């Protein structure tokens, strides 16, 4: 199966069941949104997929390969990238250097070669630099390449998080509330960026509380409630589902 699949996944913490018997698929070139009230299990699912947690039952596969017992760095190398709700940047480093750090996951030169500045390590550094610059150009951040990341505005920090994730050359991209704190103009720009990323045949799974953004951006929506799947389908179908409206969308619309 192409994409990433959760197969009857359950996660319990000392008797508290955070996710129960959950199954869904995130496919290439599809933007899938994972929505639900606070405490529904969305962050737990991201942590399960990225290897920060392990399922209590069930399994997670990518292109047919079982990821359930792999550590986070191996999952990243397999092709699963992630951005975080709070940008995980190094404020004292430049924008370009931040992306280069993330791109190191695709590096092959050993620490000894790098420390001795051997020709292979220098070639590797040049390749990593170009990979990072490619992502900055794609996200229209190249003009900020030499600027310290700590002084970049929030909207551009969100894009920098995306650039860092893309620099790992993912085939699946996990985005944790990418629109949080953005202006309407920045949200529109973010939507355009995600559509362009989708055009690269990358599978996108996003958690987002901005329902207008979700309904305008996502191709497919999975709705959680108390750790279980409440509904699944197109954005339009989910928005009209009375169970979803009662459990979540009605309250989100009132907020």
Task: Give each language-model segment a name.
Residues 1-255:
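Glycine-rich phosphate-binding loops of nucleotide-dependent enzymes
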């Amino acid at each position: 199966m192409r994409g990433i699949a959760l197969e009857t996944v359950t996660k319990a913490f000392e008797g508290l069941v955070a996710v129960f018997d959950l199954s869904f698929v995130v496919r290439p070139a599809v933007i899938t949104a994972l929505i639900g009230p606070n405490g529904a299990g969305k962050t737990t699912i991201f942590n399960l997929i990225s290897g920060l947690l392990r399922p209590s039952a069930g399994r997670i596969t990518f292109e047919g390969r079982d990821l359930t017992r792999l550590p986070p760095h191996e999952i990243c190398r397999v092709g699963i990238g992630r951005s975080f709700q709070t940008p995980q940047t190094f404020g004292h480093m430049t924008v370009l250097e931040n992306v280069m750090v993330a791109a190191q996951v695709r590096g092959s030169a050993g620490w000894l070669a790098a420390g001795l500045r051997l020709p292979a390590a220098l070639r590797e550094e040049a390749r990593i630099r170009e990979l990072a610059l490619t992502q900055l150009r794609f996200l229209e951040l190249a003009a900020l390449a030499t600027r310290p990341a700590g002084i970049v505005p929030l909207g551009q920090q969100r894009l920098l998080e995306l650039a860092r994730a893309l620099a790992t050359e993912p085939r699946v991209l996990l985005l944790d509330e990418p629109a949080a704190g953005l202006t309407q103009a920045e949200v529109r720009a973010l939507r355009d960026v995600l559509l362009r990323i989708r055009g690269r045949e990358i599978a996108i799974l996003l958690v987002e509380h901005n329902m207008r953004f979700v309904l305008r951006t996502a191709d497919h929506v999975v709705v959680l409630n108390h750790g279980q799947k409440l509904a699944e389908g197109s954005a339009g179908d989910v928005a009209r589902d009375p169970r979803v409206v009662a459990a979540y969308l009605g309250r989100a619309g009132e907020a």
